[in-house]
């Protein structure tokens, strides 16, 4: 890419979607052979052409005593640092590092608008450990120049009924000026060492770049809420033979929701939501198993009501008998818009977990699809009061059932799911494996949502 190209701002929501996953998806000819991945060749992950004939760990069985107590060596000018997110100044350091370096394009017209509340939600769920927030500092100045995080997560593969204590790896970020120092592979090895010391040997992670070897691939889709604003900042274009007024009319949403009994989730709803989600997740091949305190954290942000959180929004549907029949949730992570005379922020919502008891009524699948479409239409409506401009979801879960009806458009960004030190059979991500097009009206096998 030329320097001139680098300065061009993204011109479509699809470009935005690519950056959300820290890299662009690659076409088949661009996928390198295993021998070219010097680092991943040394790691317990399947190669691209490996035939999966059994399910289970790849590496030989170890114990924490087999793992060194000392961190991996770094280049002499750097030192390891355990980042204490309980301290505001260190939280600010992580914010600054990610804000300035998490998006590749130095001249990008937007930045992730993280907040302390978002980091506390994303990085401090029940069971979190300070030592799993690893940083690298410059010895001479103490400046934080790299960061990687792991949080505890319990995975379940429903076909085999195997439950896997794991971690989710996220927020791997190296300062742009130090990308040639090969810090990222060392950081992955170091976070692996720290996690292994707690007798955890598997991890789940995602990325837009194709590495050896995805267990599932999902496609980004997006639904404009404020089309006019997206057009103003250059993320939406005016299609041929369309007018601005026509586009506004196409994406217009009502001001009120339609589902009877819909309301914000409260902590008192936790038991019913837990049972509903637990049963609903039996539909998918790979899911996260939640304890109730974990679910309270992820759906309520550790608050007593949904309205207390500025990050996660959760809604339930209560019937006339006081039973909860449905719920949905989404989280908010806006972008700061730079160098735009009219707008300084882009509101973005990301679909999170949901469930409906209509899914359990096998005699009428069409009713379930209609119910999902109605629920997600209401999710779009509720997002307007949080100044959301575009609502994103993947082709995971049962999202293909409503994506078209709710006017989500397929982006050209993809998100690949990877299991570290575990092999399992490929899982459908709601898209055709060859064409990568969305498979409408067909469930995916991916029931776990990563930030």
Curated annotation (Swiss-Prot):
Quaternary assembly: Monomer.
Protein name: Glycylpeptide N-tetradecanoyltransferase
Active site as annotated: 451 (proton acceptor)
Enzyme class per UniProt: transferase
Encoding gene, per UniProt annotation: NMT1
One Pfam family linked to the record: NMT
Family that this chain belongs to: Belongs to the NMT family.
Species for this entry: Debaryomyces hansenii (strain ATCC 36239 / CBS 767 / BCRC 21394 / JCM 1990 / NBRC 0083 / IGC 2968) (Yeast)
Superkingdom: Eukaryota
Gene Ontology CC entries for this record: cytosol
Role played: Adds a myristoyl group to the N-terminal glycine residue of certain cellular proteins.
Subcellular location: Cytoplasm
Binding site for tetradecanoyl-CoA: 37-40, 172-174, 180-184
Region Disordered: start-end pairs: 48-69
Key words of the record: Acyltransferase, Cytoplasm, Transferase
Catalytic activity: N-terminal glycyl-[protein] + tetradecanoyl-CoA = N-tetradecanoylglycyl-[protein] + CoA + H(+)
GO molecular function: glycylpeptide N-tetradecanoyltransferase activity
EC number of this enzyme: 2.3.1.97
Native organism taxonomy: Eukaryota, Fungi, Dikarya, Ascomycota, Saccharomycotina
């Amino acid at each position: 890419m030329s320097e001139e190209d680098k300065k061009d701002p993204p011109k479509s929501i699809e470009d935005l979607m690519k950056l959300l996953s820290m890299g662009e998806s690659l076409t088949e000819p661009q996928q390198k052979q295993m021998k070219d991945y010097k680092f991943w060749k040394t790691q317990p992950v399947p190669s691209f052409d490996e035939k999966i004939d059994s399910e289970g760990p790849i590496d030989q069985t170890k114990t924490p005593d087999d793992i060194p107590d000392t961190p991996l060596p770094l280049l002499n000018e750097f030192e390891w640092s355990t980042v204490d997110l309980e301290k505001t100044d260190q939280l600010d350091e992580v914010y600054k590092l990610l804000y300035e370096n998490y998006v590749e394009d130095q001249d990008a017209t937007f930045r992730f608008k993280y907040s302390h509340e978002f980091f506390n939600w994303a990085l401090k769920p029940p069971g979190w450990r300070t030592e799993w927030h690893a940083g690298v500092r410059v010895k001479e100045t103490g400046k934080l120049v790299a960061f990687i995080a792991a949080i505890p997560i319990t995975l379940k593969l429903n076909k085999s009924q195997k439950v896997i204590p794991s971690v989710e790896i996220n927020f791997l970020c190296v300062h742009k000026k130090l990308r040639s120092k090969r810090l990222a592979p060392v950081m992955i090895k170091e976070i692996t060492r720290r996690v292994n010391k707690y007798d955890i040997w598997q991890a789940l992670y995602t990325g837009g770049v194709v590495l050896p070897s995805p267990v599932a691939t999902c496609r980004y889709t997006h639904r404009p809420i404020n089309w006019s604003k997206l057009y103003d900042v250059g993320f939406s274009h005016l299609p041929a033979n369309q007018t601005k007024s026509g586009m506004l009319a196409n994406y217009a949403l009502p001001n009120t929701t339609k589902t009877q009994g819909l309301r914000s989730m409260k902590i008192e709803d936790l038991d019913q939501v837990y049972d509903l989600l637990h049963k609903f997740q039996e539909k998918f091949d790979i899911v996260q198993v939640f304890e109730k305190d974990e679910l309270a954290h992820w759906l309520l942000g550790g608050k007593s009501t949904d309205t207390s959180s500025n990050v996660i929004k959760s809604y339930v549907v209560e019937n006339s008998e006081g039973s909860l029949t449905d719920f949905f949730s989404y989280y908010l992570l806006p972008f700061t818009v730079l160098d735009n005379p009219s707008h300084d922020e882009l509101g973005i919502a990301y679909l999170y977990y949901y469930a409906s008891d209509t899914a359990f009524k096998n005699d009428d699948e069409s009713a379930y699809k209609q119910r999902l479409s109605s629920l997600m239409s209401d999710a779009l409506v509720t997002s307007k009061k949080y100044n959301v401009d575009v609502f994103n979801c993947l082709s995971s879960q049962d999202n293909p059932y409503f994506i078209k009806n709710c006017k989500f458009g397929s982006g050209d960004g993809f998100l690949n799911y990877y299991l570290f030190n575990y092999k399992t059979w490929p899982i459908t991500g709601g898209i055709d494996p060859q064409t990568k097009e969305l498979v409408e009206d067909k469930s995916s096998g991916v029931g776990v949502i990563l930030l």
